[in-house]
Amino acid sequence: MSSFQFEQIGVIRSPYKEKFAVPRQPGLVKSANGELHLIAPYNQADAVRGLEAFSHLWILFVFHQTMEGGWRPTVRPPRLGGNARMGVFATRSTFRPNPIGMSLVELKEVVCHKDSVILKLGSLDLVDGTPVVDIKPYLPFAESLPDASASYAQSAPAAEMAVSFTAEVEKQLLTLEKRYPQLTLFIREVLAQDPRPAYRKGEETGKTYAVWLHDFNVRWRVTDAGFEVFALEPR
């Protein structure tokens, strides 16, 4: 059996500082912006010449936060409620024989300086610090297949949860938006996807959660109406 070795070509800088609450697929949180920083010796302007003409990219990356858990022949996809099992190759699970992921993201800008190449990205679904092993331009004529079928994931999951903010948090956000544009929308879109594990959905009102987004510990509680963000704590 052959084995292969690959070099890391870059690293992701993202508002998702932990894997909890990262969308399960790209494109679900449109306001999630980040950057891909190429590293030496790949941080050359020539390496990305012409890339600015493409609107979207495929990013191939390593599931670096789960790779120590090894692979599993069957997994429980969240889209099936976390109960039914499927073969790992019939899912996008992180627990794979080779911990490689792929993400389709929006390319907003290519920024080249003397010693750096930075790709500005949108609709990101990758945790901060994710190692990148390759990037490829998205080709609509070859990769957009409207007649394709996709079993249990034929359509995007609905944004299930209504998200509200306490008056105090709304006041904080008004000030923070000057430094973090679209922060309110970003938090709302992330939480609307209901990042809780499938087995915890339906929990009683009052249960609290927290997630690290940008430079803040975002704390919210379950209410009868959905989720209420009650604290933004600087980290």
From Swiss-Prot:
CDD domains: UPF0066 (cd09281)
Record SUPFAM superfamilies: YaeB-like (SSF118196)
Family: Belongs to the tRNA methyltransferase O family.
MF GO annotations: tRNA (L-threonylcarbamoyladenosine(37)-C2) methyltransferase activity; tRNA binding
Subunit structure: Homodimer.
Function: S-adenosyl-L-methionine-dependent methyltransferase responsible for the addition of the methyl group in the formation of N6-methyl-N6-threonylcarbamoyladenosine at position 37 (m(6)t(6)A37) of the tRNA anticodon loop of tRNA(Thr)(GGU) that read codons starting with adenosine. The methyl group of m(6)t(6)A37 appears to slightly improve the efficiency of the tRNA decoding ability.
Protein name in the entry: tRNA (adenine(37)-N6)-methyltransferase
Gene: trmO
Domain TsaA-like as annotated: residue spans: 6-147
Gene3D superfamilies reported for this sequence: YaeB-like
Coiled coil, from the record: none
Keyword Lipid metabolism applies: no
Assigned keywords, A-Z: Methyltransferase, RNA-binding, S-adenosyl-L-methionine, Transferase, tRNA processing
Annotated signal peptide: none
Binding site for S-adenosyl-L-methionine: P23, R24, Q25, H64, Q65, R92, V127, D128, G129, T130
Reaction(s) catalysed by this chain's protein: N(6)-L-threonylcarbamoyladenosine(37) in tRNA + S-adenosyl-L-methionine = N(6)-methyl,N(6)-L-threonylcarbamoyladenosine(37) in tRNA + S-adenosyl-L-homocysteine + H(+)
E.C. number(s) listed in UniProt: 2.1.1.-
